[in-house]
Swiss-Prot record:
Coiled coil feature spans: none
Region feature Disordered, mapped onto this chain: 601-637
Induction: By stress conditions e.g. heat shock.
Protein's name according to its UniProt entry: Chaperone protein DnaK
InterPro entries per the UniProt record, alphabetical: ATPase_NBD, Chaperone_DnaK, Heat_shock_70_CS, HSP70_C_sf, HSP70_peptide-bd_sf, Hsp_70_fam
Modified residue annotations for Phosphothreonine: T198
Lineage: Bacteria, Pseudomonadati, Pseudomonadota, Gammaproteobacteria, Vibrionales
GO MF assignments: ATP binding; ATP-dependent protein folding chaperone; unfolded protein binding
UniProt KW keywords: ATP-binding, Chaperone, Nucleotide-binding, Phosphoprotein, Stress response
Function: Acts as a chaperone.
Biased composition (Acidic residues): 623-637
Family, as annotated: Belongs to the heat shock protein 70 family.
Biased composition regions of type Low complexity, renumbered to the chain: 601-615
Length: 637
């Protein structure tokens, strides 16, 4: 196997590293920089990447693309994409499949296609250093990237001519780089990763047994709409507002001016990490009838902190959830690692120190650690690095929709990957010949509050009473966090498979909302689950009682039959409602009314010496779960 390089494909900056001997080494690009700006510019007949693209952005704002990672694997209708449309100087357009694409030089392009330009530069940088062609790569993604975004990242690699051997989570990669050469036994580390577009927190345990190190991710959480770009936007808005107060001119209508303000805001933000005051000085930023206008605004560190304080605060809530999911207290964390350029901000460092009660490590380069860890994982896959085992996790649960609109989870969040899970489900209707498998991702009990990843049909099921067929659904989650689903009729052996497609993926904001809503709505989820259980019990009671009435025939007196039918009608009138107590009460009434049926059934069973009959109906498997599937032929739901 050839060399496998490590690439940190970032929202704002990207980085590439290789193993040099047994140590990861960050490589300098053609401009002599260890990181490359994730900026792509399309000019007449030329594509520029990195600093060359950034330098010409002011004169070519509509064809200079940046923060494309915020669009990768995303749908055009996503609320976050719509907000980006308002602030980006370039055009974000809707593709035929509904994805968010971009437009430059009159050409529409998919986000992976644009990101591939950055990956190509990373590939070329590695090839120049190694003196040989490179095809294998480990590429990192935010821990909270969903199935669609991971697949889109792999697609970008393929477009760039890379075989992406593994997708790994950024905090995990940083932990690999940090822990590889550390001595002194077991450690439990918290990786706080605040990058250009996303925020992740991962709790990782490093164990060492007889020289072999195991990096096991215990939990991960995050906010996929929080990063340095959001900090920049706060500064940009402040500068634009201040200029409008002074000059009465709104710069937002001027793309060239806004590109200059964006660059100045980013520069000022960075400077305020090492100084307490800076000047934003933009001569000739715009002009009106009275002549040219200049921007000259003093910004203090205190002012910047007041603008972004809520953003920093937002990053603390996922820390609490991650610790709870790992079943750890703050005191059990031995090391805190800061990753991502935005963690250089003193306010961020102070808040993290306050939360964990200890200073973050200073021996980790926040811009380079992720790429270095990816290179280590590349070495592991290529067989160059021995005695290292990486156990990563899936950030969100996977499941299918079952009877009553419930999401039944097959793979729980924070499960080590790769993993495989299967469960047996059954039909909801008699003689059902097909079922629809509806795949979901999220944390809520109610299926509609989770994201639909896709659905497919399993046809050709042998006609049988409801609850009798056995359909085995298998979820196979690979080491990249990408899902494959199959369904198999155990009676006929017929099987259907699906790979979840990128166009059906979740939006970043939807993932963030799922986990946060799940935390806030645990009680509501519990009540909903109890209501669905009551509804399902009512359905089973009605179905079973009607069948018993039919089997009893004339043995059931007419007055008893009328009483039972009235109780069934009363239960049917409330079973679809939201009043669990009313459903439970009507179920009890039906049970009381059906006492005579039980007596008749017992008498009949005794007369026929029940149990001796070889043709007895097979007992339903206790593990079979009632599932709400579609009868494709009859359009049942």
């Amino acid at each position: 196997m050839g060399r496998i390089i490590g690439i940190d494909l970032g929202t704002t900056n990207s980085c590439v590293a290789v193993l040099d001997g047994d140590k990861p080494r960050v490589l300098e690009n053609a401009e002599g920089e260890r990181t490359t700006a994730s900026v792509i510019a399309y000019t007449e007949g030329e594509t520029l990447v990195g600093q060359p693209a950034k330098r010409q952005a002011v004169t070519n704002p509509q064809n200079t693309l940046y923060a494309i990672k915020r669009l990768i694997g995303r749908r055009f209708e996503d609320e976050e994409v719509q907000r980006d449309i308002e602030i980006m100087p370039f055009n974000i357009v809707k593709a035929d499949n509904g994805d968010a694409w971009v437009e430059a030089q009159g050409q529409k392009m998919a986000a992976p296609q644009v990101s591939a330009e950055v990956l190509k530069k990373m590939k070329k940088t590695a090839e120049d250093f190694l003196g040989e062609e490179v095809t294998g790569a480990v590429v990192t993604v935010p821990a909270y990237f969903n199935d669609a975004q991971r697949q889109a990242t792999k697609d970008a690699g393929r477009i760039a001519g890379l075989d992406v051997k593994r997708i790994i989570n950024e905090p995990t990669a940083a932990a690999l780089a940090y822990g590889l050469d550390k001595q002194g036994g077991d450690r439990t580390i918290a990786v706080y990763d605040l990058g250009g577009g996303t925020f992740d927190i991962s709790i990782i345990e490093i164990d060492e047994v007889e020289g072999e190190k195991t990096f096991e991710v215990l939990s991960t959480n995050g906010d996929t709409h929080l990063g340095g770009e959001d900090f920049d936007n706060r500064m940009i808005n402040y500068l634009v507002d201040e200029f409008k107060k002074e000059q009465g001119i709104d710069l937002k209508a001027d793309p060239l001016a806004m590109q200059r303000v964006k660059e100045a805001a980013e520069k000022a933000k960075i400077e305020l990490s090492s100084t307490t005051q800076t000047d934003v000085n933009l001569p000739y930023v715009t002009a009106d009838a009275t002549g040219p206008k200049h921007m000259n605004i003093k910004v203090t560190r205190a002012k910047l902190e007041s603008l972004v304080e809520d953003l920093v605060q937002r990053s603390l809530e996922p820390l609490k959830v991650a610790l709870a999911d790992a079943d750890l207290s703050v005191g059990e964390i031995t090391d805190v690692i800061l990753v991502g350029g935005q963690t250089r901000m003193p306010m961020v460092q102070a808040k993290v120190t306050e939360f964990f009660g200890k200073e973050p490590r200073k021996d980790v380069n926040p811009d380079e650690a992720v790429a270095m860890g990816a290179a280590v994982q590349g070495g592991v896959l290529a067989g160059e690095v021995k005695d290292v085992l990486l156990l990563d996790v899936t950030p969100l649960s996977f499941g299918i929709e079952t009877m009553g609109g419930v999401m039944t989870k097959l793979i729980e969040k924070n499960t080590t990957i790769p993993t495989k899970a299967d469960q047996v489900f059954s039909t909801a209707e008699d003689n059902q010949s097909a079922v629809t498998i509806h795949v979901l991702q999220g944390e809520r009990k109610q299926a509609t509050y989770n994201k639909s990843l896709g659905q497919f049909n399993l046809e050709g099921i042998q006609p049988a009473p409801r609850g009798m067929p056995q359909v085995e659904v298998t979820f196979d989650l690979d080491a990249d966090g990408i899902l494959n689903v199959s369904a198999k009729d155990k009676a006929t052996g017929k099987e259907q498979k699906i790979t979840i497609q990128a166009s059906g993926g979740l939006s970043e904001e939807e993932i963030e909302a799922m986990v946060q809503e799940a935390e806030a709505n645990k009680e509501a989820d519990k009540k909903f689950e109890e209501l669905v259980t009551a509804r399902n019990q009512a359905d089973q009671m009605i179905h079973g009682t009607k069948k018993q009435v039919e089997e009893a025939g004339e043995a059931l007196p007419a007055d008893e039959k009328a009483k039972i039918e009235a109780a069934i009608e009363a239960l049917e009138s409330v079973k679809s409602g939201d009043d669990k107590e009313a459903i439970d009460a009507k179920v009890q009434e039906l049970m009381q009314a059906a006492q005579k049926l039980m007596e008749i059934a017992q008498q009949k069973a005794q007369a026929e010496q029940a149990g001796a009959d070889a043709g007895e109906q097979p007992k339903q498997d206790d593990d079979v779960v009632d599932a709400e599937f579609e009868e494709v032929k009859e359009d049942k739901k």
